Swiss-Prot record:
Descriptive protein name: ATP synthase subunit beta
Top EC class for this record: translocase
Residues given in the record as ATP binding sites: G152, G153, A154, G155, V156, G157, K158, T159
Keywords for the protein's UniProt record, in alphabetical order: ATP synthesis, ATP-binding, Cell inner membrane, Cell membrane, CF(1), Hydrogen ion transport, Ion transport, Membrane, Nucleotide-binding, Translocase, Transport
Membrane-related topology note: Peripheral membrane protein
Length: 462
C-alpha cells in the first residue's frame, strides 16, 4: 500500500501527507513504519483535508512522534480478532492481548466499523431477564435483548451494580459475555478479571480495555472493538451480554478530539456530532433474528445532572433506565436505585403480568406519597398526620429498607453474604407489605435482607 509522511502532530491528532493519487479513505488504519519508540503505532483516518493530507487520531500515545516520520496505509479499517478464542482474554482497542497469555490465534478478524442490522433483520424482544436484584426486577425489569443504562454520579455504585449483574446474570444465564472497559480505572479492570477468575466464569467472558490513562483515540474506539466481538457471537446464533463501563467516557473521548479535529463545540463544550456518535454505537447494539445482544451500560452523570447533553442523549436509546441516587446512598440503602426515577418499557401488564405491574405501581405510589408528606413531617412532625398517612409513612419506610439488598460482590464491605431473590419472591414480599401483612414488624428488620421470609426471621431476633 501507499506510504506517507507526518506533517503535523497536535496531541492525539496527527496530519499525514500522502501522494495525491493514493490518499487513504476515511477510517483506514495507518501504521508508523519509521524506526523509533512509536514504530507500529496505529492511527485512524478521520478527515481528508485536501492536498493529499489526511487528519488522523492516534490509537496509542503520540510521545516520540516527529514530523517526517514514515507512515504506511493498511488499506482497511482497524481489524480485531473475533470468535471463541477471544473468551477468557484481555485485549486492547486493536484486539492485541494484554494479559501476557500469548497470541489470541482467532480464525476470524472483523473490522470495527460495521453497518447496523437492517430493519427486517431486527427482532423485538419481550422475554424478561431475571437479575435477582429486587429493586431492578420489580421497578425496571430488563428484557432479553434489550438495552439498559445504569445512571449515576461519582461514587454511588454504578460499577458495583454492574459487577453484581455480571455475577448474577453471567452465572445463571450461562451465555457468553463481552466486557468493554471504556475509560475506567485500571484497578477496576484488574478487580473484574480476578472476580471472574474466582467465580469460574472467565472462560465465558471476553474483555476489552481502554483505561483512563489511554489517549482519546483509544477510548473512542474501544467500545466498537467490544461491540464487534459481541456481534460475531450474535451472528453465530448465540445470546450475548455486552457490558460497557462507562459509556460517558466514550462521549468524553469524542469531545477531547473534536476540537483538535477543527469542529466547533456545541452545548456545554461537547462535540457537535454527539448524537450521531452515540447513534452509530447504539444502533449496532441490537438483537436480530439469529441471536440477541443484551447490553448493560454504566452512564456517568456529570455533577449529578441528568439533563447534561451526554446522559440525555443516551436516554433516548435505552429500554430500561436504572437511576442511582446520592440521596438514597446517603441513607445507607444499597443498591442506591431511585424507584421513582427508574423506568422500563417492560413494566407493562401485557409483558410482566397484572400482579407484577400492580405491585410495582403500588410501591411507587406509596413512596411518592411519602415523599410529598416529608415536608409536612419536617415542619409539623409525625403527630399532625392523619391515621391513614401515618400508615403510608410506616409502610413506605419499610419498602425503602426492603429495596436494599446485600450483594455477592460487596461481601467484603458489608460482611453479610450476598442474596439472589427470585422475581416471584420479590413480588410476594412487596405485595405483602402493601397489603399490611407485615405492619407489626419493626422497620429495621427489612434492612439488608433477601426475601420477606428473612425479614420475619430477623424480626424475631430484634
Amino acid at each position: 500500500m501507499s506510504n506517507g509522511i507526518i506533517v503535523q502532530v497536535i496531541g492525539a491528532v496527527v496530519d499525514v501527507q500522502f501522494p495525491q493519487d493514493a490518499v487513504p479513505k476515511v477510517y483506514d488504519a495507518l501504521k508508523i513504519v519509521s524506526e523509533g519508540q512509536s514504530k507500529g503505532l496505529v492511527m485512524e483516518v478521520q478527515q481528508q483535508i485536501g492536498g493529499g493530507v489526511v487528519r488522523c487520531i492516534a490509537m496509542g500515545t503520540s510521545d516520540g512522534l516527529r514530523r517526517g516520520a514514515e507512515v504506511s496505509n493498511t488499506g482497511e479499517a482497524i481489524k480485531v480478532p473475533v470468535g471463541m478464542k477471544t473468551l477468557g482474554r484481555i485485549m486492547n482497542v486493536l484486539g492485541e492481548p494484554v494479559d501476557e497469555q500469548g497470541p489470541i490465534g482467532a480464525e476470524d478478524n472483523w473490522v470495527i466499523h460495521r453497518e447496523a442490522p437492517s430493519y427486517e433483520d431486527q427482532s423485538s424482544a419481550t422475554e424478561l431477564l431475571e437479575t435477582g436484584i429486587k429493586v431492578i426486577d420489580l421497578i425496571c425489569p430488563f428484557a432479553k435483548g434489550g438495552k439498559v443504562g445504569l445512571f449515576g454520579g461519582a461514587g454511588v455504585g454504578k460499577t458495583v451494580n454492574m459487577m453484581e449483574l455480571i455475577n448474577n446474570i453471567a452465572k445463571a444465564h450461562s451465555g457468553l459475555s463481552v466486557f468493554a472497559g471504556v475509560g475506567e480505572r485500571t484497578r477496576e479492570g484488574n478487580d473484574f478479571y480476578y472476580e471472574m477468575k474466582e467465580s469460574n466464569v472467565l472462560d465465558k467472558v471476553a474483555m476489552v480495555y481502554g483505561q483512563m490513562n489511554e489517549p482519546p483515540g483509544n477510548r473512542l474506539r474501544v467500545a466498537l472493538t467490544g461491540l464487534t466481538m459481541a456481534e460475531k457471537f450474535r451472528d453465530e446464533g448465540r445470546d450475548v451480554l455486552l457490558f460497557i463501563d462507562n459509556i460517558y467516557r466514550y462521549t468524553l473521548a469524542g469531545t477531547e478530539v473534536s476540537a483538535l479535529l477543527g469542529r466547533m463545540p456545541s452545548a456545554v463544550g461537547y462535540q457537535p456530532t454527539l448524537a450521531e456518535e452515540m447513534g452509530v454505537l447504539q444502533e449496532r447494539i441490537t438483537s436480530t433474528k439469529t441471536g440477541s445482544i443484551t447490553s448493560i451500560q454504566a452512564v456517568y452523570v456529570p455533577a449529578d445532572d441528568l439533563t447534561d447533553p451526554s446522559p440525555a442523549t443516551t436516554f433516548a436509546h435505552l429500554d430500561s433506565t436504572v437511576t442511582l441516587s446520592r440521596q438514597i446512598a446517603a441513607l445507607g440503602i444499597y443498591p442506591a436505585v431511585d424507584p421513582l426515577d427508574s423506568t422500563s418499557r417492560q413494566l407493562d401488564p401485557l409483558v410482566v403480568g397484572q400482579e407484577h405491574y400492580e405491585t410495582a405501581r403500588g410501591v411507587q405510589t406509596v413512596l411518592q406519597r411519602y415523599k410529598e408528606l416529608k415536608d409536612i413531617i419536617a415542619i409539623l412532625g409525625m403527630d399532625e398526620l392523619s391515621e391513614d398517612d401515618k400508615l403510608v409513612v410506616a409502610r413506605a419506610r419499610k419498602i425503602e429498607r426492603f429495596l436494599s439488598q446485600p450483594f455477592n460482590v460487596a461481601e467484603v464491605f458489608t460482611g453479610s453474604p450476598g442474596k439472589y431473590v427470585t422475581l416471584k419472591e420479590t413480588i410476594r414480599g412487596f405485595k405483602g407489605i402493601l397489603d399490611g401483612e407485615y405492619d407489626d414488624l419493626p422497620e429495621q428488620a427489612f434492612y439488608m435482607v433477601g426475601s420477606i421470609d428473612e425479614v420475619v426471621e430477623k424480626a424475631k431476633k430484634l
